[in-house]
Amino acid sequence: MINVFRAMLVAALLACPFVCVPLAANDDAVTPMQGIPPTRESQVTMANYRDYPMSMWAFRNASAVLNTVMIPREGDIRPLPGPLRPEIGERRFTDPQGRELSFDALFQANYADGVLVMQGSRLLHEAYFHEFNERSHHIWFSMTKSLASTVFGLLVAEGKVDLDASPVKYIPELKGSGFERVTIQQVLDHASAINFKENYTDLQSDFALYYAPALNMGWLPGAADVQPADAEVYGVQDFLVQFIQPDPALNPGEAFDYNSSNADLLGWLIARISGEPLQDYIQRNVWAKLGPEHDAYIAVDRALVPVATGGMNTTLRDAARFGMMIRDRGEFGGQQVIPAQWIDASLEVSDKVAANMAANPKYGEEPWTAYHNMWWILDADKGEYCAVGIHGQVIYINRSADTVMAWFSSQPGASAARNPEFRAKLQAARELAVSLTRKL
């Protein structure tokens, strides 16, 4: 059966390569989902939903493309009072391409779908582009990792987790896997020294043949259709048990190697230790306490288990509410949602963690100074850090400026920091935060 599956998947890949090919942003681009029924050239599918311009429709309608489960809101809506400051959208910035643009024009030119600026409890600015609006949901992708780490902190504070223990202590099924020799803290820092690599070009890799179909988020076209019910690997947790092995060239804690399977494991730990499905744990402990305007939802893998590595979907305002809670050390609306000690821990960067980032050649020209507890650190002393997702999703937090900015994007390139469109938006946000600091 596995050989049949391999043949079917490789045939599908050869027929429709899964590597995203960026398209230029121009008026000639196909408008997604045009016509009743949609024309074939404008049809969004699991095979093309991450390709621009199809992504402009798909990222705000992810529940139409992916399997999802609901994370319901409850209680009163926490208002985001103004007044709005129109001059923020008109402020001029120079992007990395040398173009002088207004704040809003810069974000729109760099494939943003929406951007929002908060200082304190005040909503200073929000702008939406294309067909996106304040009621639209948008997929977070890997910003979800930071959310998972945040709720994990509750279990740590309750004494239910030992960060220096192996994950095997809580998930015995992982005994003999690459995760047996690591600590949970090393998993949180992507320093687990496992041999699994997210290889998007080797069609015979474990990633292509097993992980991507199990994840069921369209990383490989046709994956939802070609995976047989009796496959060796059905869901992501099956993959973690069967395929993750230690990297013989590395010891845990020696290197920063960003790897989505670490967040998959974190989601499993949360569910196993709490005794609740991940979506229920998030809803009860975080989402219900943020006064969101809308329900959230999260993509699930083939086994219908929430994708902790990249499945969250919310509106932009509700993403900002989460960012405000993080900025304010876990407090929101007069209640302590997450222990302040855990929120602060993400900014307590050891010399070793910082050195691991500096030593990784992938990030040599990037602004990040560290990656810790599944957050991207810019300046720990200023409390400046981010949740980041592929295709340009960001929650930017700056404690010293009392500022949170959030933006969603459909930028063609998947990689975030190594993308000029991503850099342009992050640079403008950081410059704006500095100017807002001067007015405090």
Walk through the language-model features, giving the residues of each:
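Active-site Gly/Thr loop motif
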Residues: 293-296, 347-404
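Active-site SXXK
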Residues: 121, 139-163, 187, 266-270, ...
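Active-site helix/loop module of the DD-peptidase/beta-lactamase fold
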Residues: 139, 143, 157-202, 245, ...
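Short active-site loop at a secondary-structure junction
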Residues: 106-116, 129-160, 164-178, 182, ...
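N-terminal leader/targeting segments and the immediately adjacent pre-domain N-terminus
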Residues: 18-132, 161, 189, 193, ...
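Active-site-proximal alpha-helical segments within enzyme catalytic domains
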Residues: 190, 262-269, 310-331, 393-410
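Catalytic-site signature segments of enzymes, centered on catalytic residues
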Residues: 128, 134-135, 199-202, 209-303
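Structured C-terminal helix/loop/strand segments within mature extracytoplasmic catalytic/sensor domains
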Residues: 26-42, 384-440
